[in-house]
């Protein structure tokens, strides 16, 4: 079975979150269209994401060797094991769906902490001194979707100026070697339930075309 990794970044329950509501509809529809996939879910507000400490690394984005690992205390070793587990989980997936709100022109901090964990030398990227880093996740077909909710309606100009989250996620995915990337914006959720529902319904209409864009 192929694997879809569904990553959510919102403390709200699904029924109150526009990004998670659209995210659920998206993954359900994807699984309907692609029965050879199974889903694995990762809630970054419930999952422990290690804070990266210098003791965990022997060089940039490269975890410590065995000798250095054995000198760490038990808690530090557990943190290193968690980083490896998160990175392996990401690497094993075929399709990635990330659902997050726009916060401060970007996204909630847990997503950045997670990305810092999984961009790892020898696993998702190849980093050699004096050479340009290369992504390692071009080893098989992969695709990624970033589902983002925002209160404001994003015209082209406003999106370029304010929407840093989508551009960053696309860049980091391609940096790791994942070339197929699509965005699914749930913008204009506004301040009323009616506005939010309209934005969600509009996003629902785009789900099939986004799925076709990544797989």
Swiss-Prot record:
Belongs to the azoreductase type 1 family. Its EC number is 1.6.5.-, 1.7.1.17. Quinone reductase that provides resistance to thiol-specific stress caused by electrophilic quinones. Also exhibits azoreductase activity. Catalyzes the reductive cleavage of the azo bond in aromatic azo compounds to the corresponding amines. The gene is azoR. Binds 1 FMN per subunit. Keywords: Flavoprotein, FMN, NAD, Oxidoreductase. Homodimer. InterPro entries: Flavodoxin_fold, Flavoprotein-like_sf, FMN-dep_NADH:Q_OxRdtase_AzoR1, NADH:quinone_OxRdtase_FMN_depd. It catalyses: 2 a quinone + NADH + H(+) = 2 a 1,4-benzosemiquinone + NAD(+); N,N-dimethyl-1,4-phenylenediamine + anthranilate + 2 NAD(+) = 2-(4-dimethylaminophenyl)diazenylbenzoate + 2 NADH + 2 H(+). Coiled coil: none annotated. This is FMN-dependent NADH:quinone oxidoreductase. It comes from Clostridium botulinum (strain Eklund 17B / Type B). HAMAP family: Azoreductase_type1 (MF_01216). FMN binds at residues 17-19.
């Amino acid at each position: 079975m192929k694997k879809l990794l569904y990553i959510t970044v919102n403390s709200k329950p699904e029924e109150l979150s526009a990004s998670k509501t659209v995210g659920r509809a998206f993954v359900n529809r994807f699984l309907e269209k692609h029965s050879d996939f199974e889903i694995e879910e990762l809630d970054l507000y419930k999952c422990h994401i290690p804070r990266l400490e210098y003791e965990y690394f022997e060089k940039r984005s490269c975890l410590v060797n065995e000798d250095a690992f054995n000198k760490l205390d038990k808690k530090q070793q557990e943190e290193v094991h968690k980083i490896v587990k998160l990175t392996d989980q990401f690497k094993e997936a075929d399709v990635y769906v990330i659902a997050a709100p726009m916060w401060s022109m970007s996204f909630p901090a847990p997503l950045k902490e997670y990305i810092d964990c999984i961009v790892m030398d020898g696993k998702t990227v190849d980093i050699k001194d004096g050479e340009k880093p290369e992504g390692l996740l071009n080893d098989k077909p992969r695709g990624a979707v970033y589902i983002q909710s925002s209160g404001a309606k994003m015209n082209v100009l406003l999106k370029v100026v304010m929407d840093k989250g989508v551009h960053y996620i696309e860049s980091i995915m391609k940096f790791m070697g994942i070339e197929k990337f699509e965005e699914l914006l749930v913008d204009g959720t506004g301040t009323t339930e009616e506005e939010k529902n309209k934005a969600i319904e509009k996003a629902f209409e785009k789900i099939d075309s986004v799925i076709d864009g990544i797989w």
